[in-house]
Amino acid sequence: MAAQTTRPVEEITAEEARAAHEALSAEIAEHDRRYHGEDAPIISDAAYDSLRRRLEAIEERFPDLAGTGAASASVGAKASDKFAKVRHAVPMLSLGNAFADEEIEEFVERVRRFLGLPASESLAVTAEPKIDGLSLSLRYEGGRLVTAATRGDGEVGEDVTANVRTIREVPERLAGPDVPEICEVRGEVYLSHADFAAINARQEEAGKPLFANPRNAAAGSLRQLDPSITASRPLRFFAYAAGEMSTWPAETQSGLIAAFRRFGLPVNPRTTRCTSVAEMLAHYRAIETERADLGYDIDGVVYKVDSFALQRRLGFVARAPRWALAHKFPAQRAVTTIEAIEINVGRTGSLNPLARLRPVTVGGVVVSNATLHNEDYVRGIDADGTPIRSGINIWDGFALRTDVDLSRGSDVRVGDTVVVLRAGDVIPKVADVVLERRPADAVPYRFPEICPACGSHAVRSYNPRTGKLDSVRRCTGGLICPAQGQERLKHFVSRNALDIEGFGETSITTLFEAGLVRQPADLFRLDFAPLKAAIVARRQALSAERALASGKAPEARKTKAKASEEDKAIRNLLAAVEARRVVPLNRFIFALGIEQVGEATAKALAKHFPDMPALMEGVRAAAAHQPGPDWVGLAALNRVGPTTRERLLAAAEAGETDLLAEGTVARLSAAQKEALLEAYGSPEGVRAAVMRACRQRPGDAYRHLADDSEIGAVTTASLIQFFSEAHNVAAVEALLAQVRTERAAPPAAAAAFSGRTVVFTGSLERMTRSEAKATAERLGAKVSGSVSAKTDLVVAGPGAGTKLKDAEKHGVRVISEAEWLAMVEAA
């Protein structure tokens, strides 16, 4: 990065201005590419705005530089090659930004002056929340959705129609008699805070990288190559503008919003019409106050001249309209010091770093803790090793530094001065490090490789599908780790696992805290007397707590009748445990809570192995015949994959010396050759890597599991990790001393269901979803969560939604719950 002067624009020379303009333009263009093109920004919005404002200030003082750089008139970033291109009939432009009340007054005065409006004539302006999401254009023809596209560079966007059709809030057809024949709707795709938290929880559970914020999650979800991934994430949409229209349903912006509402499009309810600067600022203050309670991210208020006739007269300048302006909120951030970094062990074994801060007020709330997400975040890199922080300089209000050698690193250390961000109810996070304030004795934080809760190894699993380490480091203690203990026990006794009746969360908590049950085998060693003592002690403690809180005396001793009922309940618990001394093998496997092993995978493993000792021996054999890193890494390269890897191996083993030459067995495309050369440097380097991969092929014991479509390489790696820990093996063997497994009976050979795919949707009134699934599988059917051309039957209850549309689209038969039960009875 070229060095730039940090002096005020008013003091720099023309030569300094030209150099700064060139560097800033290139830098902004790169940040646009990362933000809009890759959904992976490395600086905050505030830092980006600071860069833009400095560029604009330079262009204002040196007009000959305006329009000469890469960023002066640019909007967004070039559309990705991964998607088909869509040229916007009307460009999707950006907005100018304002941060101070005075700038709003200047905006209104500038508009009035341009239009020549007398002081006596009012100017109507709409004010609406600025949603922090991904811009989207929806094109309807004849009322039907035909195309959905991202903004891209403003002129050409990405075709994401298939993905957008999975968003519930985007109608397939517009309603009403006045819908234009061509109606291009502009708006924002976003995620609510609650949905964002749920998505990140699923990401963490799966050992995948967490999304940094709802905007990144929404953008990443919308720009998936697989629409089913988009469909699994509850994206939302607000409509707020129009592109090409064959006829206009309104003459004002406020009228257009009303028309959109009539058409069935979601619009933001906090949009209002103002007739003075005072009203505009009052609405801005009101929305700023409500910001934390909206349930989704906004970063300001957008003002638009209400009249379309006046908008047309005002026109555009550079990359933005003269008739609109974004009034940005001040970032909810503060600068403080990290006093310590602590590790919390999550219920799934994840090691979660937490920064203990010198207390500081952020957005009106005193903050003393902030999340550091994971090990890579502490180190200041993403999964690919790319820096995610740039370091900041205080002089310009947290703007990107241009005078710091980034090789010093922007990792997070104890003693660092850091910028803390807080948005709504989201846990505060450490966003950046002030490198110039780093203490001389600050040392890089060493992430623990031993679980602080149980002393087991903590590892980052290698993902054989991607060739990368998972972002989360996890404890391998599994069944013996106290931090995971209660949750694993709750899973063990749950309905879909061993299904031990009567053992709910309260029972498990009581037994765990009393020290009676620490691992699953302990459940089968329970005796009446200690079990009763633990339950009675828990009841008395809760009674005393309630009495203290209410000021009343604790409840009297139990009568003989109540004591008898209590004894009966305890005997029922013990009987429920005894009833599970013999269990189906697949339930036993699922109950162990092995990462990546869900119900379907447990059933697949139960087909492969007759019992647990055979499974454990099979996993040990697979571990001894795992592939080497070169074999895995070759397929993990962009544009290569397993099929091309096998062709490369075949070519190398056939004695071909230049694997990149035309006419070889490898049959490589230009893009694949480029990826291989980028990874290995030269044709000789490529051949050397392929030859190493040949020697690192996995053995049959490994492929027996990894090549099975119902198990796969990722699950195989997880099984190897689990059973490589001696304490996990000991816990399973202790359990097998108490429990006997049996193979599940083969599915009934019912011609009506065998080999068919069934989907359940809506509310089922006469059975639970689990019961429905179990019944279908017992009769030989496969139960799927989504409808496709391969689906044979959809069972729909009340409230069925998009799956019904999908069934109609693919011509899949749809029946009611009653019809399904009749078919089951007949089978």
From Swiss-Prot:
The active site is at residue 130. Keywords: DNA damage, DNA repair, DNA replication, Ligase, Magnesium, Manganese, Metal-binding, NAD, Zinc. Its EC number is 6.5.1.2. Its cofactor is Mg(2+); Mn(2+). Zn(2+) binds at residues 451, 454, 475, 481. SUPFAM superfamilies: BRCT domain, DNA ligase/mRNA capping enzyme, catalytic domain, Nucleic acid-binding proteins, RuvA domain 2-like. Belongs to the NAD-dependent DNA ligase family. LigA subfamily. This is DNA ligase. It comes from Methylobacterium sp. (strain 4-46).
